[in-house]
Amino acid sequence: MSATSVDQRPKGQGNKVSVQNGSIHQKDAVNDDDFEPYLSSQTNQSNSYPPMSDPYMPSYYAPSIGFPYSLGEAAWSTAGDQPMPYLTTYGQMSNGEHHYIPDGVFSQPGALGNTPPFLGQHGFNFFPGNADFSTWGTSGSQGQSTQSSAYSSSYGYPPSSLGRAITDGQAGFGNDTLSKVPGISSIEQGMTGLKIGGDLTAAVTKTVGTALSSSGMTSIATNSVPPVSSAAPKPTSWAAIARKPAKPQPKLKPKGNVGIGGSAVPPPPIKHNMNIGTWDEKGSVVKAPPTQPVLPPQTIIQQPQPLIQPPPLVQSQLPQQQPQPPQPQQQQGPQPQAQPHQVQPQQQQLQNRWVAPRNRGAGFNQNNGAGSENFGLGVVPVSASPSSVEVHPVLEKLKAINNYNPKDFDWNLKNGRVFIIKSYSEDDIHRSIKYSIWCSTEHGNKRLDAAYRSLNGKGPLYLLFSVNGSGHFCGVAEMKSVVDYNAYAGVWSQDKWKGKFEVKWIFVKDVPNNQLRHIRLENNDNKPVTNSRDTQEVPLEKAKQVLKIIATFKHTTSIFDDFAHYEKRQEEEEAMRRERNRNKQ
């Protein structure tokens, strides 16, 4: 590349350009005016170097390469995309000074006329500087590099495209009436625009490169910055700038009630919300004591006042709420609702009580006959009706024939076998006690029949009964006959059982599982006896422990307490069975 020297002469002289290392023909001679488009950018660049006092002066080893092409002849379209920054090389590191990459991040465009230099790099003339767009002006680029810091340069695009006004030290617009913010750099101007709520919602949003009108810019300027008089700029301190964001705070006060506490005194809505969960006429939450019995749903709906009364007062009101006995077929409904008032205060000694379907009131006493005096407080005297009195002779007859819960039981077996029986429901337990029979599954019947035959009368075969999910054993019976596989009892709650054998009930009492859980069976993976399957055999030594605990346990409840209830259920099931058989015919 040949070295060319250009004489800088005043504009208008017609001197020729002298070129070294070559001759010039007449057709190659050019005037100074021909270099005007190319020399304009070089002239601007000669005055664009920062002073020596700038702490961010670039290293003089980094060459300054100008952009060799001019965009003065290119057409300017306002509908194009945003300008792409001109990426330059890295500045050299020297003397420990800070150097930055003068790319699109730091090198920000200046006025619309040209781009200000950054760290000694040449500007990039994004907007053309010909006469067609002389209204924008380029005079602001000459003294722009004389600012105190390299960070003072900021965007010079039209204010509507950036949402703020042009700061001091930037190039303005030739025919624009915008006034500059005095003494505020780009960083300070950015801080003034930090507003939480923002009152510039009405401002027109523009993108870089769109057409702007002077009236639109004037309206935006009035919304973004306060009006400044044409007098001398007043020095602005940081304290004054810090006070500016506090102006829109009164508009944000309603937003503070949402839940973000910004003030020292809570707003009234928060105080009102603290009363959630209380009654409208009272200020305290009405809660029942932890030890108070839980009232049934009907009692709470009818009279909510007993919630805060002592338990004796609550129990005394129950006969008034249910003065008339319901129909016999409704016996199963009211009794479970009234039973908690009677049983729960006195049944603290019960452990792992099965809540369903045992809690149906002490309609019968296991030591004496049935009578109206045996009904507890709050229990509806349903069994006193003529239809329920028919059940009492059945229980009395059973107690007269069988000596239930004997005190002289010999649990120390020398020869015998013991099996676990798991029943699906207490209905079948009731009918087994009533008819002295039992039936297991097909596999269970075979196992029990083989065990009974193996003893050959040399010892008893005891069955330990427990209902699935009850949490207790309900009694002990002795197997008295072999299994009749062809017999069909027709009394069970489910019609799928086939076969039967005779049993004799010895103990009828509820023994909680926690009384027997410590006894483990080595023939059942060392599991507790309470976790056994149906017809699971208990080894003789472990069976002695189980029989001893059941025989000596002082029980408080048994299935006899609900005997009348299960009698009524059996009558209903038989009536439904007869109805189905009649429909089949």
Swiss-Prot record:
Q: List the residue ranges forming a coiled coil, or say none.
A: none
Which residues of this UniProt protein bind RNA?
422-424, 428, 438-439, 468, 492, 497
Domain YTH: from-to ranges: 416-550
Q: How is it modified after translation?
A: (Microbial infection) Proteolytically cleaved by HIV-1 protease when incorporated into HIV-1 particles in a nucleocapsid-dependent-manner. Cleavage by HIV-1 protease probably ensures optimal infectivity of the mature virion.
State the source organism's domain of life.
Eukaryota
Renumbered to this chain, the Low complexity biased-composition regions fall at 329-351
Q: Where is this protein primarily located? A: cytoplasm
Q: Does the keyword Acetylation apply?
A: yes
Induction of this protein: by what?
Following heat shock stress.
GO BP term, example: positive regulation of translational initiation
Question: Looking at the UniProt record for this protein, which Gene Ontology cellular component terms does it annotate, in alphabetical order?
Answer: cytoplasm; cytoplasmic stress granule; cytosol; P-body
SUPFAM superfamilies given in the database record:
beta-sandwich domain of Sec23/24 (SSF81995)
Q: Which positions does the site annotation (Microbial infection) Cleavage cover?
A: 157-158, 538-539, 570-571
Show the ranges annotated as biased composition (Polar residues): 15-24
Residues recorded with modification Phosphoserine = 23
Alphabetical UniProt keywords: Acetylation, Cytoplasm, Host-virus interaction, Phosphoprotein, RNA-binding
Region spans: Disordered: 1-52, 243-277, 304-351
N-acetylserine PTM sites in chain numbering? 2
UniProt subcellular location:
Cytoplasm, Cytosol; Cytoplasm, P-body; Cytoplasm, Stress granule
> Domain comment, in the record's words?
The disordered regions have the ability to interact with each other and to 'phase separate' into liquid droplets within the cytosol following binding to mRNAs containing multiple m6A-modified residues. This leads to the partition of m6A-containing mRNAs into membraneless compartments, where mRNAs may be stored, degraded or used to transport mRNAs to dendritic arbors in neurons.
Query: What is known about its subunit structure?
Result: Interacts with CNOT1; promoting recruitment of the CCR4-NOT complex. Interacts with YTHDF1. Interacts with YTHDF2. Interacts with PAN3.
User: What's the stated role of this polypeptide?
Assistant: Specifically recognizes and binds N6-methyladenosine (m6A)-containing RNAs, and regulates their stability. M6A is a modification present at internal sites of mRNAs and some non-coding RNAs and plays a role in mRNA stability and processing. Acts as a regulator of mRNA stability by promoting degradation of m6A-containing mRNAs via interaction with the CCR4-NOT complex or PAN3. The YTHDF paralogs (YTHDF1, YTHDF2 and YTHDF3) share m6A-containing mRNAs targets and act redundantly to mediate mRNA degradation and cellular differentiation.
Q: Report what the protein is called.
A: YTH domain-containing family protein 3
Provide the species name: Homo sapiens (Human)
